Structures are given as structure tokens and as C-alpha cells.
Amino acid sequence: MRGCLQSVKWLTSALRPSQSLASSTRYPRRLLSTSAPRNAQVRKPASEVEQRIAAIPIERFRNFCIVAHVDHGKSTLSDRLLELTGTIEAGANKQVLDKLDVERERGITVKAQTCSMLYNHQGEDYLLHLVDTPGHVDFRAEVSRSYASCGGALLLVDASQGIQAQTVANFYLAFAEGLKLVPVINKVDLPSADPQRALDQMKNTFELDPESAVLVSAKTGLNVSQLLPTVIEQIPAPVGDRTKPLRMLLVDSWYSTYKGVILLVRLFDGEIRAGDQVVSFATGLKYTVGEVGIMYPGRTAQSVLRAGQVGYIYFNPAMKRSQEAKVGDTYTKVGSERLVQPLPGFEEPKAMVFVAAYPVDASDFPHLEDSINQLILNDRSVTLQKESSEALGAGFRLGFLGTLHCSVFEDRLRQEHGASIIITPPTVPFKVIWKDGKEEIITNPALFPEEDTLRAKVTELQEPFVLATLTFPEEYLGRVIELCESNRGEQKSLEFFTSTQVILKYELPLAQLVDDFFGKLKGSTKGYASLDYEESGWRRSNISKLQLLVNKVPVDAVSRVVHSSQVQRLGRLWVSKFKEHVDRQMFEVVIQAAAGRNVVARESIKPFRKDVLQKLHAADVTRRKKLLEKQKEGRKKLKAVGNVVIEHKAFQAFLAK
């Protein structure tokens, strides 16, 4: 028996080397047969890109953006440039840099998006960094941040429409930042195109040399190949020194479920790699870099980012709190804090339009809060404050740069986060000047002083005005002036910058501008007008708080500060619309709109009525009157003590657009 056991042990020990040898030879072979090709597919392009980038000095970097009026072809031109450089396949996608669903649905750019490109010019590789910027005035903050990453810009003008209001605004914004501007005339293939008129407008309005302009069709690709050599020759390379301590600007950020907060950064000096320890100047918090890379066009990991580049980083452990990522913040390596001067950052945009947002189901409040915080991480121009309503429960007071900004944010909440929300109509801030000299900005109508307080303690009420620039064909001049005058506007200037195009400037109350002014303007000009505006200070105004009362009890979710000229119209609209959504009660329901102590409109909902005369003889008049009086008295008592039951869906329907 013992001999058998020894034989087994000997055989086992004898077999082990061969087994381990066989397994060691077979196992790597199995690894190579499965994972190596997959790694080759993923890593080979990245390594080729990285090798090419490593060989390019900063003198052959070019950072540029495309700026234009909305719908002049920025995103389509971006697609053609990405195809030309081989970053994407030709015809593989449309509007690659319009990544949000709402951008594709509306056909506008909302978020400034970035992409790095490699381009060989005269035998030398160049690293080009492209930023596709929004055109609408509501997203001006996105445009301003984009300029911090760029040394120049392609100023794009539609050959059929010419210079528009936001072309002018974006030009002066880029000019103020010191960007080198390259004029580009787009859509020259259209039958209605007039490139010479657009060139003349650029020369007369911006003093840009027509000889330096490039005439293209982004849709067909005509002359697009001439753009990149022009960018290389005319736009300067970024300035930076990779041997200096790291100095890195946070340009944008977004949230990933697995990576935490991802930062889009522009390196002014130094280098950054995975594993580096960095510190924020704004918060003092320290982080370990988990990965660095470029957008090509999606996230493409790199071993290093150098001075002059724009790329992304995320940390390990991840940055989980969105409040830590402050756009405009400067980062450097731990230990270099005293050697680095922080960058100036960005001017904080001021919210101009405010709404209240409530979840349809009160139990969804935590989900709504989390969704809003994630969106604000990607859009820092939104302001946020918690508030509550007796009618609608817990919610938020949100501030935006304009009504389109608000509408897009609402769409993103619904599409990207599945939020079911109730949004109140947009309002603007108002200024209260108290008799003791203090000034207060009111953004929530519920906090507006009551009538007695206004008389006793307030010196003056003011509302914000804007300077609106409107461009449109000359034939609609009369209609546009009439529209502006009916909205309490004051004309400032009128000029013809071509024989048929007009630039009209009006000072308008911001409250009128957010009340679908742009929609009315489009209607008056058959869609040919464009609008841009900027702040124009505060003015004294005759304003009051309009409230909705149900049986003399104010409904806190429905109140608004309006000019005296709007009180009657809005009051009548409110009571008639609210009446449609309130169910009948056992007693009469009175719906009123009141400005201060003055009731400006009223509607009544008749109660359910029981036929108390059903069993009476037709000739019994005395008994008939007695029963009707008794029913009437009973209703009065019920009305005095009863509460009106208003369903949550009634508010939802009333506040719906």
C-alpha cells in the first residue's frame, strides 16, 4: 500500500513540470488568439495619433473656432473639416459635434463642442483644435468660454442672407478677445446666394479685407479644402512652454456615471500625465489624474497633454461633487502653487429669465434635484435655488440667460433624465429701492412686497431694459417699428447697411422681450428678421404683482410681476384659462385676478345643485321659497368653512404652454 502511494506521489511530481509547461505554453497562446487582435484594433490608431502628435512642436498647433449667426452652417462646415482631415469617414455622420438630442431636433448648436484634427500641410503635420460654437444670443457664455481656448476664428456668413444681428455681436465679442478673424462666405451654391454683397458687408461693417475671404459651400464641400491652409497661414500658434510648471484652465465639464466629473482643459504651460497630483486654485482640493486625452472626435486616451493643447482629464479617485468643478479655475501640480500665477478665468454670466420647476410627482424631487445638478455641471450659466409652494410642493427657482436657454434646459431634463416636471411661465428680475436707501433684486414674484409695504417703505420700483439690435429687409420696417412701440420700446437708431437691409436698435423692457417677442418679430417679417440684445440698465417702472385668487385665497404658484399696461389683459387670460381646469364643488368657486387690492378679472364656477323641489306640489309656492332659501343658506355656510379642492393636474394644465 505504502509503495502504491509513493508511486502515485512520484508520478504526480513527475507530471507537474510537463503540465505546468504545457499550461504555460498553451495559456499565452490562448490569450494571443483572443485579446491581441482586439487590442490591436483599439490601441493601434490611438498610438499612431499619439506618435504623430508627439512629433509636432507647439509652433505647428492651431486652435480656432467657428462663429456665426444661428443657422449659417457652422456644424455642417465642422463636419466637412473633420472629413477632410480623416478624423471621421466621409458621410458617416451629420453634425458630429452636435451631440445633444435637443441640438439635432432643433437644428441649432447649444453646447460648444471640441475636436482635435491632424492635417499634413506642405509635408509637415499640424495639430488643429476646432471648436463649434452656438450662434444664439442665449448661449453667449458658451461662445465666450470657447474663445479662451482659441487664437483665431472663422467668421462665417450666409451668402444668401448676409450679415445678421448675431454675426455683429459675435464679431465684436471675438474682436474684444483679440482673435484673428478669417472671413468665410458659406452657401455660395444656393440660387439666391450673393457672395459679393456679403463681402461688401464684411468690408463696410467689420473692415475685413475681402481678398482674405474664402468662398465655400459646406453642404457640397466646394472650396472647403482651401480653409485649412488659410487657418495655418493666418491664425497664430498658441503661446506656451512645456518646460514650465503646469498651468491649466478648466474650460468645461460634464458628468459620467463611471468616471465621475470629466474636465475639458486648455494647457497654457507644462505637461500633464496620468498619475500626476494636481491642485485647484479655487478650492484648494488635490486630485490624482486617472486619464488624459483628446477629443478625436470622441474621448481618445493619450499618455501626455502638452502646453498649447486642449483635451480632457478625469481623476482617480473620481471627482464626484459637481460643485468642485468651477469653470474658469486654474490647476497646477502639487508643490508648484507658489510658482504659478492663476489665470483670470471667466466673467460670471447674469441670469436674465427665471422660472420655477416642480416635479409632477412629489416623490420624484430627489431625482429632479440630481438631474438638475448634473445638467448645471455642463451649463454653469444656470442659477439654482430651492423653493416650495403650497400648491405644488418642493421645487426649484432656476435662472437662465434667455427664453431659448430655458426651453433647451427643460428639453434636456425631459430627454436625458426622463424628468416629469411643471415649469412656470418665465419672469424677469425687478429692483426694489427702499426708503432707507437699500436696493434689493427680486427674482421670485412671491417675495414681491405687498401693497401696504410698497406704500409705507418703498421709494421706487425698477425693471431691466435691453438694447435690442434687429436686422431685417427694408420692406418690413413699418411693421417692426409698430411691434417695438406696442411693446413699450424706445427707438435709438436706424441705419441701412445695404440698399435693402435695415439695422434697427430699440431699448425694450426685458419683460416684453421674454413674452414671445421674437416669435412676434418673425411673424411680422415672415421669418426674415434676426435679433440680438445686450443689457441696458434699470429704469423706473409702474409695476405690480398680479395674483390669482380662488375664493379670495391667493394661489402661491400663480403670481407674476407685470407692468400696469399688461394687468387687464393677463388677468382676464388667467381667470378664463384656470376656470377650464378646476372641477365643480358643492359650493360656488370664485376665481379672481388681483393687482394689489384691485380685482381686475373674475370668473365663477357654479356649484352642484340638488333638486330640493322634486317632491313638492306645483301650487305650494311658500314651501318652495322656504326650501330654496334653506339650500342657499347651507351653501353660504359650506363656502365659508369649506376648502376648494384643486387637483394637481389642474395646475399642470394651467401652466402648460
From Swiss-Prot:
Disulphide bond pairs: none
Enzyme category, top tier: hydrolase
Entries under InterPro entries matching the protein: EF-4, EFG_III/V, EFG_V-like, G_TR_CS, LepA_C_sf, LepA_CTD, LepA_IV, P-loop_NTPase
CDD domains from the UniProt entry: EF4_II, EF4_III, LepA, lepA_C
GO terms assigned for molecular function: GTP binding; GTPase activity; mitochondrial ribosome binding
Bilayer topology: Peripheral membrane protein
Known EC number: 3.6.5.-
Gene Ontology cellular-component terms listed: mitochondrial inner membrane; mitochondrial matrix
GO biological processes: positive regulation of translation; translation
Keyword Transit peptide included in the entry's annotation: yes
List of residues binding GTP: 121-128, 185-189, 239-242
Catalysed conversion reaction: GTP + H2O = GDP + phosphate + H(+)
Subcellular location as annotated: Mitochondrion inner membrane
PROSITE patterns the UniProt entry points to: G_TR_1 (PS00301), G_TR_2 (PS51722)
Residue stretch of the organelle transit peptide: 1-39
Keyword match Cell inner membrane: no
SUPFAM superfamilies, A to Z: EF-G C-terminal domain-like, P-loop containing nucleoside triphosphate hydrolases
Keywords of the record: GTP-binding, Hydrolase, Membrane, Mitochondrion, Mitochondrion inner membrane, Nucleotide-binding, Protein biosynthesis, Transit peptide
Domain tr-type G: 59-239
Protein task: Promotes mitochondrial protein synthesis. May act as a fidelity factor of the translation reaction, by catalyzing a one-codon backward translocation of tRNAs on improperly translocated ribosomes. Binds to mitochondrial ribosomes in a GTP-dependent manner.
Similarity-based family: Belongs to the TRAFAC class translation factor GTPase superfamily. Classic translation factor GTPase family. LepA subfamily.
Protein's UniProt name: Translation factor GUF1, mitochondrial
Organism: Ajellomyces capsulatus (strain H143)
